[in-house]
UniProtKB/Swiss-Prot annotation:
Name by which UniProt lists this protein: pH-response regulator protein palC
Species this chain originates from: Cryptococcus neoformans var. neoformans serotype D (strain B-3501A) (Filobasidiella neoformans)
Alphabetically ordered keywords of this record: Coiled coil
Key word RNA-binding present: no
GO CC entries: plasma membrane
UniProt-annotated stretches for the region Disordered: 449-488
Pfam families from the UniProt entry: BRO1
Length: 488
């Protein structure tokens, strides 16, 4: 169930006074504070990796909020030559989106800009994981598949669920905006470093996290997850009807528009598919590819084919590849379901054949996702996760497919009966039908970085010459900025 739960990066400890030279001795205290703030981030990430009590994505977000202004100040002072590296700098990080055959190593990444990139990546992933934790804490409100107990919700649960869904959507939009900003800003500063020997993965290859395409894809994935969460919120008011009424026609009067839902799911499918295409850019060069089979995920294929991801050293982790493949397929199936319902319910009896074509196609796609052979192939691909967690995720994904398949079968049965007894219309092939374009309901939330905690002293001197009140040497004023305090 979206959003995807990411493994967060981890890093080693750094003492800035040990790697930076401060010729003017103006930044001794500030560098000590920067080291303390980075240590807090290190401990927050380590706590999650070690499953320590109290560790959470919220603690990581708090640590990033404190450290990022210090990091920006250090970068500004390095650019102004007021701070200098004592030697060749390396910042060790574990890359959570890059697959490794064995345990993920600490990669020595060159340049302070690599450090900046990994911190911003941590911020985006932690925002998504925080949204995931909010949704996981909500009462169960979707109908379970099969003859199981129906969820029961009090009015207090309904308020809490509505607020939780809205908050999760906002967090995911923030995360999407952070990833988009990183792709257009920080990644461009890391690109020239790709020829540097340190930080490489294999033969001249950096981790997937260093790629601009990866951040663009990540922004799309997070935005798609936000839309799916928004759709859940959109359908929440009709929960009572869906709990007690059998699936199939007619829709209740207060049900969200069928064409709107179809266009939303088409947009989600477009985002996931575009993300898959962008992630293929970071795959191994042909000369170093282990085999042609490792490229199957991104080869051209029919929409109904779900190509299984393979675990290839240095490429995107197979769990994320599989997530994109399945969510793209599921979104397209649900889009076709709602296109069929729109044709059947709003066509005044003139489009029963078209409605039947759409819902039958949706049924076929959902059955492909439910195929037991395909699930057996996927079983061993969740590397790095506990067995129980893999079972829970598979069970949750399976429940969604089963639930939707039951609903679609009811619509197919209803439209088939209507066509056989009343309409007598031919059922056209889906390829002959016009698919509308997808429709977004929001975009990424623009990310404006917080101001630096301190700045080069010569900027302060310039302010004095211009007659402005300048802050204390090496520090900046605590000005307001868009999104201030809205880190989590």
């Amino acid at each position: 169930m979206p959003p995807y739960l990411y493994r967060l990066p981890t890093t080693s400890l750094i003492t800035f006074s040990a790697i930076l030279n401060d010729p003017s001795s103006s930044y001794t205290t500030i560098l000590s504070d920067a080291t303390a703030s980075r240590t807090k981030l290190h401990l927050a990430l380590k706590g999650i990796a070690d499953n320590e009590p109290g560790a959470s994505a919220l603690a990581v977000l708090d640590a990033v909020q404190i450290y990022l202004p210090y990091l920006k100040g250090i970068i500004a002072c390095l650019d102004a030559d007021e701070l200098l590296f004592k030697g060749e700098p390396t910042f060790q990080w574990r890359a959570p989106l890059t697959h490794f055959s064995f345990s993920s190593p600490l990669l020595p990444l060159a340049s302070i800009h690599s450090e900046h990139l990994m911190v911003v990546l941590t911020y985006a992933l932690a925002l998504s994981n925080y949204a995931h934790s909010i949704l996981a804490s909500l009462p169960a409100f979707e109908i379970p598949a099969g003859p199981k107990a129906m969820p029961h919700m009090s009015s207090e649960d309904e308020k809490r669920t509505t607020a939780g869904l809205a908050r999760a959507v906002d967090l995911l939009c923030q995360a999407s905006g952070v990833a988009e900003w990183a792709a257009e800003n920080v990644c461009l500063q890391v690109e020239p470093l790709k020829g540097v020997s340190s930080g490489r993965l294999g033969k001249g290859k950096w981790p997937a996290e260093s790629s601009r395409e990866t951040f663009k894809a990540l922004s799309m994935i997070l935005l798609a997850d936000a839309h799916l969460t928004a759709i859940r919120k959109l359908l929440f008011p009709v929960l009572t009807y869906t709990l007690f009424a059998p699936p199939g026609p007619p829709l209740p009067p207060n049900h969200p528009s069928a064409p709107l839902q179809a266009k939303l799911y088409l947009y989600v499918h477009q985002l996931y598919s575009s993300a898959r295409a962008l992630l293929s850019v970071h795959q191994q060069p042909t000369s170093s590819a282990p085999s042609n089979s490792s490229r199957k995920l991104f080869r051209s294929n029919t929409d109904k084919d779900v190509i299984e991801p393979e675990a290839v050293e240095g490429e995107i982790i197979p769990e994320l590849k599989r997530y994109l493949a399945k969510e793209a397929q599921l979104a397209l199936a649900l889009a076709h379901k709602w296109l069929g319902i729109d044709a059947g319910e709003n066509g005044k009896g003139a489009k029963v054949g078209e409605a039947l074509a759409w819902v039958k196609d949706a049924q076929g796609r959902l059955e492909d996702l439910e195929d037991s052979k395909m699930r057996a192939k996927l079983k061993g691909l969740s590397i790095g996760k506990s067995r129980e967690r893999k079972k829970e995720e598979r069970r949750a994904r399976m429940g969604r497919v089963e639930r939707e398949l039951e609903v679609v079968k009811a619509w197919v049965k209803a439209y088939q009966k209507m066509n056989d007894t009343v309409a007598f219309q031919p059922v056209p092939p889906v390829s002959s039908l016009v698919t509308p374009s997808g429709r977004p309901i929001f975009g990424p939330k623009a990310f404006i970085p917080p101001p630096s905690k301190f700045s080069p002293s010569r900027i302060g001197h310039l302010n004095e010459e211009q007659g402005n009140d300048s802050p204390e040497l090496g520090e900046t004023e605590d000005t307001s900025y868009a999104g201030k305090g809205n880190y989590f």
